[in-house]
Swiss-Prot record:
GTP binds at residues 641-648, 687-691, 741-744. Residues 641-648 are annotated as: G1. Pfam families: EF-G_D2 (PF22042), GTP_EFTU (PF00009), IF-2 (PF11987), IF2_N (PF04760). This is Translation initiation factor IF-2. Belongs to the TRAFAC class translation factor GTPase superfamily. Classic translation factor GTPase family. IF-2 subfamily. GO terms for molecular function: GTP binding; GTPase activity; translation initiation factor activity. NCBIfam families: IF-2, small_GTP. HAMAP family: IF_2_B (MF_00100_B). Residues 666-670 are annotated as: G2. One of the essential components for the initiation of protein synthesis. Protects formylmethionyl-tRNA from spontaneous hydrolysis and promotes its binding to the 30S ribosomal subunits. Also involved in the hydrolysis of GTP during the formation of the 70S ribosomal complex. SUPFAM superfamilies: Initiation factor IF2/eIF5b, domain 3, P-loop containing nucleoside triphosphate hydrolases, Translation proteins. It comes from Lachnoclostridium phytofermentans (strain ATCC 700394 / DSM 18823 / ISDg) (Clostridium phytofermentans). The keyword Cytoplasm applies. CDD domains: IF2_eIF5B, IF2_mtIF2_II, mtIF2_IVc.
Length: 1131
């Protein structure tokens, strides 16, 4: 056996090329790709390995053959017996290369003269790899034989067809020249020159010239098996009768459109656009040659769809006319998937020409028109000659029309060749192959490729002496083309000339194809998609030429140098540009984002404002909890209200403890956290201060709780801090329960309290609202049980849940620095469980939990959700109200703390920058007369530090600004005193004492050190200190009025005004204003006051006196004198 290409063997066996290549390589063969030839020994080795996969579907194919045979065997009985023989004896074709060069030569004579099975056998043998009727595909082919008789030439998994392509939807036969002997059920032979014998049940022969016999049921012909009426495989339709659009040989569409050649209702009656031989359209219109949307056309030319062979209802095409709306033809295939002799995935291509645009023909046709021979741009044509009008005759073609063998180099396939996987006579992978496969799809039935198919990779090149040579294998075969015999010398010459013209046309088109980036190359070069092909990199010029839009991210304020660096330009260029625009700047000048954006646009750069990501928020962000892991937790209740309204006393009554007696001044100055058990249910209470100084504490309390109890005294009613507490609770989205306290007092008025709270949208339930009001008395413990029941009921309605099996997370209620224990933080666990030994981070502080104590001071090992505990082990005092998190390890805690610290530094730096701006500096210079009171605040707990700082800062006014230069937790120490001495500050200690060393230094350095236990006192003293710093203010005080009665002149004294005191009294050293007839003529000091000749200190009303004014002597009688003094006004 001769050599064979791997891909041909792969098609035969129905396996992937690479599988065989890999198999051979594993056996030590030197094959490199599926295009390599392999020896007979290797072929047998591969067949032995993969033969099982080929024969696996045989029964199915046989069944198909039989099934299609049983339908209606009553017509065309002349050849029934012979047709029945063929499928009943399936020929399993072992694939072998082209043998018996003379077999095909005499095939047509045998076909014409005899209808014997010998002819059938002849076709089968010729069909070895090149001319087989059936393409073997795993999808259940409807070939004549069983499925094992694979077509050695065409093997495409996608069912790209060739003459011998079989597809699940009705494949055709693989032989080009069908022996149209008797076939059951419309199987067509693949021979071009059909023996148009009778066929039962409308089977079509494969002959080009239609035998217009009747066909019932329109079953498809030779190679076409489609469920809905497939076509036969011969170009000339056997235009038998077909109902319901079953197609024939060439048309392969599931909807049964189109038949081989002529589709007319008269051709054999076909209702509703059933096609025939050549037309492949989804609607079934179309014809052999030209397909127009209206489907006119003819064997020659037919206007308006009138048929020649038979009439066509509107829209069925004819043999000759084909239009470019994607209708396929024998030759015309479009990307819309129209089928062809060999149907292909893109549907383009034809028997001969396959182009990406879907043109194609038996020979060559531009723009998708196709006919048997030459196809013209208009797509019209007839069986033989297709002209724009579609006239033509069967044989004669003037004007260079193509013939059976005219093929173009532009990747058009011949009988077989197709680029991109279209099938061929003996189909080749990726479209190679003509008669025996041509690379790049050139190939023809017997194309006159003497001058044009010179590509060394061409397949069997058909020349004028009708010999073909395979340059790869060296085999030669001289198979005479029956159709070529029919052509006269003149016709060949005309076709040859026409090919020359078309070649030029196609060259241009091919050039366009390359420019458009199409896969197919202009000269029919090798398929660029083949394995191992060199892929030319695409030019990147267009990308390079595009101006890339740059984007820079800039902050709110930046210097010109920073902007220039971000834009990657020289700073001096930016300065120069601004200078030319009239702006005097330097590279260190600061500009706003808007100005920077304008500058950047001048350089075609888009500026985007920098969005500061809050690292802290990102770190504190947490995922949603799984509902299945949630368990019920105790409610956290916050007691809020105005100072002295009885919040702590109410808690005492609930806890049956006495807390108030321990609070300085009887008012609460810390947040107290307690756990109370009521009827087996735990409730966590937070007691917040009611004094106005503790606003932030109340806010923290509201944020960390589920229910807020608003305590309002029945005798006092709604007070300022009550309103503030309502605001905090609403802002935190907390359910409010109003406890009206002190109802045991005689002056208690519950209804007035309800009315006042209505103004703040708290309406009692008995007034039609939804707020729970509970009258209680902390003193007599009246209403306490009812209040607790309401708390538990509200908590149940809220369905309070938390996941205890996770890392702990919560809020810091209070923090302090204990002399013996170090930093102590009171925290409320909100999620998870906190254990002793856990690493935690609170803002910028972190540490390991060394010990935990509950609200009663007992050591505990763990704290579950809604449990308040005190923890030890932090490296610094955290700020109250911050969130704490337990972490996996200390390193993670340290990283989070560092993020907090760095963010705090950035914020401080930004504040400092803002303060040091020129505008700020100028305003400070202007306000140089403002005095500052520097304070250092030390307190026992962090919450108190905040409260004192906020209260004192509020005291600032236009003349004296209170400045807290340091605030901290713990006792007053040496460093605090030194800082106060340096900055001339007053130290305020709240519930703390100075140590001995600090006290000595304070006395030595004369540092004012004030200690307080009640916040009221601290505020009052600071107010007094501020007043002492204020500049004194004076106002005018009128002493009395006098009238000048007589004027005296005295040497050495000047003019003396003898005056009478009208009211008040005149005192020495006062000032005077003199008015004459309503006009003030003098204002100045009184130089001398005498009564008669004696100097006196004062003169009362009704007495006379002498007045001398400084540097004023122009006094006249009856002038009015007003005397006043400037008196200091206390502040």
């Amino acid at each position: 056996m001769a050599k064979m290409k791997i891909h041909e063997l792969a098609k035969e066996l129905g396996v992937d090329n690479n599988v065989i290549v890999n198999f051979l390589q594993s056996k030590g063969s030197e094959v490199k790709s599926y295009r390599n030839n392999i020896e007979e020994k290797e072929i047998d080795l591969v067949r032995g390995k993969f033969k099982g996969s080929v024969s696996s579907n045989e029964p199915k194919s046989i069944d198909n053959g039989k099934a299609s045979r049983v339908e209606k065997p009553e017509k065309n009985n002349s050849v029934t017996a012979k047709a029945d023989q063929t499928p009943s004896e399936p020929v399993v074709h072992k694939q072998r290369p082209m043998t018996a060069q003379g077999e095909r030569k005499n095939m047509s004579e045998q076909n014409v003269t005899t209808g014997s099975t010998e002819s059938e056998d002849n076709i089968q043998s010729v069909g070895d790899r090149k001319y087989q009727h059936t393409d073997r595909r795993p999808q259940g082919n409807n070939g004549e034989g069983p499925q094992t008789s694979t077509n050695s030439g065409d093997r495409r998994p996608q069912g790209q067809g060739s003459y011998g392509d079989r597809r699940p939807q009705g494949q055709n036969s693989g032989d080009r020249r069908p022996y149209n002997g008797d076939r059951p059920q419309g199987q067509n032979s693949g021979d071009r020159r059909p023996y148009n014998g009778d066929r039962p049940q409308g089977q079509n022969s494969g002959d080009r010239r239609p035998y217009n016999g009747d066909r019932p049921q329109g079953q498809g012909n030779y190679g076409d098996r489609r469920p809905q009426g497939q076509n036969s495989g011969d170009r000339r339709p056997y235009n038998g009768d077909r109902p319901q659009g079953q197609g024939n040989y060439g048309d392969r569409r599931p909807q049964g459109q189109g038949s081989y050649g002529d589709r007319r209702p008269n051709s054999g009656d076909r209702p509703q656009g059933q096609g025939n031989y050549g037309d492949r359209r989804p609607q079934g219109q179309g014809s052999y040659g030209d397909r127009r949307p209206q489907g006119q056309g003819s064997y020659g030319d037919r206007p308006q769809g009138q048929g020649s062979y038979g009439d066509r209802p509107q829209g069925q095409g004819s043999y000759g006319d084909r239009r470019p709306q994607g209708q396929g033809s024998y030759g015309d295939r479009r990307p819309q998937g129209q089928g062809s002799y060999g149907d292909r995935p893109q549907g383009q291509g034809s028997y001969g020409d396959r182009r990406p645009q879907g043109q194609g023909s038996y020979g060559d046709r531009p723009q998708g028109q196709g006919n048997y021979g030459d196809r013209r741009p208009g797509g019209q044509g007839s069986y033989g000659d297709r002209r724009p009008q579609g006239q033509g005759s069967y044989g004669d073609r003037p004007q260079g029309q193509g013939n059976f063998g005219d093929r173009r180099p532009q990747g058009q396939g011949g009988y077989g060749g197709r680029p991109q996987g279209q099938g061929s006579y003996g189909g080749r992978p990726q479209g190679q192959g003509g008669y025996a496969g041509r690379s790049q799809g050139q190939g023809s039935f017997g194309g006159f490729n003497k001058d044009f198919d010179k590509d060394k990779d061409s397949g069997y090149t058909r020349s004028f002496d009708k010999k073909r040579t395979d340059p790869k294998s060296g085999e030669k075969s001289s198979i005479k083309s029956d159709l070529a015999n029919e052509l006269t010398k003149e016709q060949r010459a005309a076709a040859f000339n026409d090919k020359s013209r078309d070649r030029d046309r196609n060259r241009d088109r091919g050039r366009n194809n390359v420019e458009d980036g199409n896969i197919k190359s202009a000269k029919g070069k090798k398929d660029p998609n083949r394995k191992g092909a060199f892929i030319m990199p695409k030019p990147q010029q267009s990308l390079e030429k595009q101006d890339e839009i740059k984007t820079v991210i800039i902050p709110e304020v930046l210097t010109i140098k920073e902007l220039a660096d971000k834009m990657k330009v020289v700073p001096s260029v930016v300065v120069k540009k601004l200078f030319l625009a009239g702006k005097m700047v330097s590279i260190n000048s600061e500009i706003t984002f808007e100005e920077a954006e304008e500058i950047a646009l001048g350089y075609e750069i888009i500026a985007e404002k920098e969005v500061l990501v809050n690292k802290v928020e990102e770190l504190l962000k947490e995922d949603d909890e799984d509902e299945n892991l949630m368990v019920k937790r105790p409610p956290v209740v916050c007691v809020m209200g105005h100072v002295d309204h009885g919040k702590t006393s109410l808690l005492d009554a609930i806890r049956e403890a006495n807390v108030t007696s321990r609070e300085a001044g009887g008012i609460t100055q810390h947040i107290g956290a307690y756990t109370v058990e009521v009827n087996g249910e735990k409730i966590t209470f937070l007691d917040t201060p009611g004094h106005e100084a503790f606003t932030s504490m109340r806010m923290r309390g509201a944020k960390s709780t589920d229910i807020a109890i608003l305590v309002v005294a029945a005798d006092d009613g709604v007070m300022p801090q009550t309103v503030e507490a309502i605001s905090h609770a609403k802002a935190a989205g907390v359910q409010i329960i109003v406890a009206i306290n002190k109802i045991d007092k005689p002056s208690a008025n519950i209804e007035r309290v309800k009315q006042e709270l209505t103004e703040h949208e708290l309406i009692a339930e008995d007034w039609g609202g939804d707020t729970i009001f509970v009258p209680v008395s902390a003193h007599t413990k009246e209403g306490i049980d009812q209040l607790l029941e309401m708390i538990i009921l509200t908590a149940e309605m809220g369905e309070l849940k938390a996941n205890p099996d996770r890392m702990a997370r919560g809020i810091v209620i209070e923090a302090e620095l204990d002399k013996g224990r170090g930093t102590v933080a009171t925290i409320l666990v909100q999620k998870g469980t906190l254990h002793v030994g856990d690493n935690i981070v609170i803002g910028s502080t972190y540490g390991k939990v060394r010990a935990m104590m509950d609200d009663k001071g007992r050591r505990v090992k763990e704290a579950t959700p809604s449990t308040p505990v005190e923890i030890l082990g932090l490296n610094a005092v955290p700020n109250a109200g911050e969130i704490f998190m337990a972490t996996e390890n200390e390193k993670e805690a340290r990283n989070i703390a560092d993020a907090f610290i760095s963010q705090g530094k950035e914020r401080l730096l930004a504040d400092t920058k803002a303060k040091l701006s020129l505008d700020g500096l100028f305003s400070q210079i202007q306000a140089g007369n403002i005095k500052e009171l520097n304070l250092i605040v030390k307190a026992d707990v962090q919450g108190s530090v905040e409260a004192v700082k906020q209260s004192l800062v509020k005291l600032s006014n236009e003349e004296v600004a209170v400045r807290i230069i340091h605030g901290g937790v713990g006792a007053i120490n040496e460093s605090d005193v030194m800082l106060a001495s340096t900055s001339n500050a007053i130290i305020i200690g709240f519930n703390v004492r100075p140590d001995n060393m600090a006290r000595e230094i304070a006395e030595r350095e004369k540092v004012d050190l004030r200690l307080y236990r009640v916040i009221y006192s601290a505020i009052e003293d600071v107010e007094a200190a501020m007043k002492g710093m204020l500049d004194p203010t004076f106002e005018e005080k009128v002493m009395g009025h006098a009238e000048v009665r007589q004027v005296f002149k005295a040497s050495g004294l000047g003019t003396i005004a003898g005056s009478y005191v009208l009211d008040g009294k005149i005192v020495r050293g006062c000032s005077a204003r003199i008015t004459r007839e309503g006009t003030q003529i003098f204002e100045g000091a009184l130089a001398s006051l005498k009564r008669f000749k004696d100097d006196v200190k004062e003169v009362n009303t009704g007495y006379e006196c002498g007045l001398v004014f400084e540097k004023f002597n122009d006094i006249q009688e009856y002038d009015l004198v007003e005397l006043y003094m400037m008196v200091e006004v206390p502040r």
